[in-house]
UniProtKB/Swiss-Prot annotation:
Chain span(s) of sequence motif 'HIGH' region: 43-53
Source lineage: Bacteria, Pseudomonadati, Pseudomonadota, Alphaproteobacteria, Hyphomicrobiales
UniProt keyword Protein biosynthesis, yes or no: yes
EC number: 6.1.1.4
One Pfam family recorded for the sequence: Anticodon_1
UniProt record, GO biological process: leucyl-tRNA aminoacylation
Subcellular location: Cytoplasm
Name listed for the protein in its UniProt record: Leucine--tRNA ligase
Family recorded in the similarity comment: Belongs to the class-I aminoacyl-tRNA synthetase family.
Length: 874
């Protein structure tokens, strides 16, 4: 038995060097074994990894190591999502070039990732800001353009006049730019868009086949795509009330059955009818300006008070020319959805009800719940959105909702105005085409040229990549490419005249929408992929990342893969066969009396009779223990992975990340549990060394027979092997760790016996120790390598095959059943695993505890739940 402690600080770098020197994690594309592609979402090179990265990449690494041991040709690459705004901010704030800042950060973070002991194929590494990467992205842009999947169109955008850039809706806060604070303007601008809507139905339908994706992620994508079946209705406008040239208002509704409950029409502030009305109404113009000041982010709209302005325009009900509806400009109607106009049926829509209650428009219920008297059914403060029968709806009365929808559609489809039907059944999608133009320097240049004679001209493929210039300055607001004295000035490749480059760059979501395909052959200099290789290695078998990317990144990647298929780069539709969303790492917060946050490293926790107390280590002053929250710099509740690895080793950090909770749930950081993981590492080290001593005289060949003790140990070993194997396959890593601990206890019990083990038990001990080390090797690979050598193996455990389960050892000779009398537990009974019901019944009725509980009463029946419970009813 060794008296030395396991020294992670010495061992971990040594094993990492061996892995690198032997290139054991390098994947060969021509390997004939079945492939397994595991990928974690690649990081943005911000400068340092955080503890959430450790969890994310550990999850993938466990799976990669396991599948490699199972005999798969594992592809487990790493790269950098390297374009983006933070690099430009750093250039402005720190006077450092975005390129230098980015590559310095990559070098620092790569060193950190290596220290975690990840089984990555670093030979495939790239950054999306490498010209050798975005060259192929530009080529695909041109391919997509030729295939009709890229267009240039006028779009209304949020323009920051100080930063001189387009802002996403989410970047407009109270009508001002999130960074500059300038009042945001609405502008019409030419934008490059990917035609993702061409795949709306396909993207929706294919979700049904993604059965290894979380249901919540698929639901989020369904809602984002937002398929709705309804009716497009052309409401006539009262000519006495409308601006010149306006005659009708088109709305799309999924509830045409509620037309007789309509009380108002509402249009977006951007609707042409609103603009026409505002031209002659200063008050309306001011109201529209206020709406635009608040912004059009969905969150802002949802939380803002519902407001409207009566334009004075009146719409005519399609079934009653004498019935007109007021047309409001409302702050909750967006031009991006449907037609930018709705009719409001307040009795059956809560938002509409709140609106009419504010403006005194009243409501008329038109759907009555089954079993309720229509004469007494009224709506006050809560809209009814359930099923029922139609009321107050003339020719629809008595119909179901479905019948009423169909009847309204039939009637309006058959009525004409101006040679076209008043109603038309339509399928609408919430999904909009993907605008990719960004007025930023640090992004992939869009490979087109603008010529006064030839208009938009693609950059010839032979001239790719269009490389970003390094000599840019950020002393002026706006896009540094616009200010560059020479970069944008070129010769038109079509006519030879003077022309200019496109100075917009691509949305960084484009960069991450195909990187997984590039990893299959990043050495191809002439094409984005090598189709034969990509088609063999794709799709990604297991993708791992945060749920915050459930919509945009995953949806864009699904579109991009289809577009790549349409242009001949891959043959599959879906990029990710399996998707796993891990939880966050969270931590307590600590605050001084004045409310300032304190770093956990500066706090000492004391546990006494009154519970936990926090004090500032330096001064001893009391610190308030706040709620457990997501780690953030602002609340100073972060933990530096380097500190943990330096203090305890990477394996301890990995083990803690896997053991505390299911991987799809948040894990609460706890110094105490980290220390517990460190103690367990030392315990495993001792167990392995003790096992070597105990099995020193074990026979080299397997004994013909095993004693009860040896057989029990072998059953524990193979039972743990079976459970951990299944647990890793299901990504139930925390359960796996519990089984490993349980098995370690069983081995420790054997080793604790003072007697020298018989040869069969010594052989079983050696086998058990080997299985134990292999079980924890995906989670704690450095410790496993060290233990593997102690066990006498010459090779690396990272190259060893996963042990075979001996199924006959999983068959239990006996089973223990809970015994109840009249539903109350009275004890347990152990019987043969193949015992029949009469034998079980006899054994149970013979128990003293059962006899006492029955107290002489006759047994009426015995209920046996197989392999679980026996309930005696007396």
């Amino acid at each position: 038995m060794t008296s030395e402690r396991y020294n992670a600080r010495e061992a971990e770098p040594r094993w990492q060097r061996q892995w690198d020197e032997k290139a054991i994690f390098a994947t060969k594309n021509d390997d004939p074994r079945p492939k397994y592609y595991v990928l974690e979402m690649f990081p943005y090179p911000s400068g340092r990894i955080h503890i959430g990265h450790v969890r994310n990449y550990t999850l993938g690494d466990v799976l990669a190591r396991f599948m490699r041991a199972k005999g798969f040709n594992v592809l487990h690459p790493m790269g950098w999502d390297a374009f983006g705004l933070p690099a430009e901010n750093a250039a402005i704030e720190r006077k450092v070039a975005p390129k230098a800042w980015t590559y310095d950060n990559i070098a620092a973070m790569k060193k950190q990732l290596r220290s975690i002991g990840l089984s990555l194929d670093w030979a495939r590494e790239f950054a999306t800001c490498d010209p050798s990467y975005y060259k192929h992205q530009q080529k695909m842009f041109l391919d997509f353009m030729q295939a009709g999947l890229v267009e240039r169109e006028q779009r209304k955008v949020n323009w920051d006049p100080v930063d001189m850039t387009v802002l996403a809706n989410e970047q407009v806060i109270d009508g001002r730019g999130w960074r500059s604070g300038a009042v945001v303007e609405q502008r019409e601008m030419n934008q490059w868009v990917f035609k993702i809507t061409k795949y709306s139905q396909e993207l929706l339908d294919a979700l049904d086949g993604l059965d290894r994706w979380p249901d919540k992620v698929r639901l989020m994508q369904r809602n984002w795509i937002g398929r709705s079946e309804g009716l497009l209705i052309r409401f006539a406008l009262d000519p006495k009330t409308v601006p010149a040239g306006e005659s009708e208002l088109k709305i799309f509704t999924t509830r045409p059955d509620t037309l007789f409950g309509a009380k108002f029409m509402a249009i977006s502030a951007d609707h042409p009818l609103a603009q026409a009305a505002a031209a002659k109404n200063p008050e309306l113009a001011a109201f529209i300006a206020e709406i635009k000041r608040i912004g059009t982010a969905q969150e802002a709209i949802d939380t803002a008070e519902k407001q409207g302005f009566d334009t004075g325009i009146r719409a005519v009900h399609p079934f009653d020319p004498s019935w007109t509806l007021p047309v409001y400009v409302a702050n909750f109607v967006l031009m991006e959805y449907g037609t930018g106009a709705i009719f409001g049926c307040p009795a059956h829509d809560q938002r509409d009800l709140d609106f009419v209650n504010k403006y005194g428009l009243g409501n008329t219920p038109v759907v009555c719940p089954e079993g309720q008297d229509p004469a007494s059914f009224v709506i006050t403060d809560t809209a009814y959105d359930g099923d029922g029968r139609m009321i107050n709806s003339r020719f629809l009365d008595g119909m179901t909702i479905a019948q009423a929808k169909d009847e309204v559609a039939k009637r309006l489809e058959s009525e004409q105005r101006g040679g076209s039907p008043i109603g038309e059944r339509q399928v609408n999608f919430r999904l909009r085409d993907w605008g990719i133009s960004r007025q930023r320097y640090w992004g992939c240049p869009i490979p087109v040229i603008h010529c006064a004679t030839c208009d938009v001209v693609p950059v010839p493929a032979g001239d790719l990549p269009v490389v970003l210039p390094d000599d840019v300055t950020f002393d002026k607001p706006g896009n540094a490419l616009d200010h560059h004295p020479t970069w944008k000035h070129v010769t038109c490749p079509k006519c030879g005249g003077k022309a200019t480059r496109e100075t917009d760059t691509m949305d960084t979501f484009v960069d991450s929408s195909w990187y997984f395909a590039r990893f299959t052959d990043p050495w191809n200099e002439t094409a984005p992929t090598t189709p034969a290789v990509a088609n063999r290695m794709m799709p990604v078998d297991q993708y791992i990342g945060g749920v915050e990317h459930a919509i945009l990144h995953l949806l864009y990647s699904r579109f991009f893969t289809r577009a790549m298929k349409a242009t001949g780069h891959v043959a599959m539709d879906e990029p990710f066969a399996g998707m796993f969303t891990q939880g966050m790492v969270v931590h307590e917060t600590y605050q001084k009396a004045d409310g300032t946050y304190v770093n956990p490293a500066d706090v000492k926790i004391e546990v006494g009779g009154n519970g936990r107390r926090a004090v500032l280590t330096a001064t001893g002053e009391d610190i308030t223990i706040g709620p457990i929250e997501k780690m953030s710099k602002s609340k100073k509740n972060t933990v530096d992975p380097d500190d943990i690895i330096e203090s305890y080793g990477a394996d301890v950090a990995r083990w803690f990340m896997l053991s505390d909770s299911p991987p799809d749930r948040d894990v609460i950081w706890s110094d105490e549990r980290v220390q517990g993981a460190a103690r367990f590492v030392q315990r495993l080290w001792r167990l392995v060394n003790e096992s070597v001593a105990a099995s020193a005289e074990a026979p080299s060949s397997r004994p013909a027979n095993f004693s009860a003790d040896a057989l029990a140990l072998r059953k524990a070993a193979h039972g743990a092997l079976d459970k951990v194997t299944g647990g890793i396959e299901r990504l139930h890593f925390n359960v796996c760790l519990a089984h490993i601990r349980e098995f370690a206890n069983a081995l420790a019990d054997v080793l604790a016996k003072p007697a020298k083990p018989a040869p069969d038990l010594a052989w079983a001990t050696r086998e058990a120790a080997g299985i134990l080390v292999q079980l924890f090797s995906p989670m704690m690979p450095h410790l496993a390598e060290e233990c593997w050598q102690v066990l006498g193996h010459s090779g690396l455990i990272s190259e060893a095959s996963w042990p075979q389960i001996e199924r006959d050892l999983l068959v239990e000779d006996s089973m223990t059943l809970v015994v109840q009398v009249n539903g109350k537990k009275r004890g347990e009974v152990t019987v043969a695993s193949n015992a029949q019901n009469p034998e079980i019944e006899s054994a149970v009725l013979a128990l003293d505890a059962v006899k006492v509980a029955l107290d002489g009463k006759p047994v009426r029946k015995v209920i046996i739940v197989p392999k679980r419970i026996v309930n005696v009813v007396g």
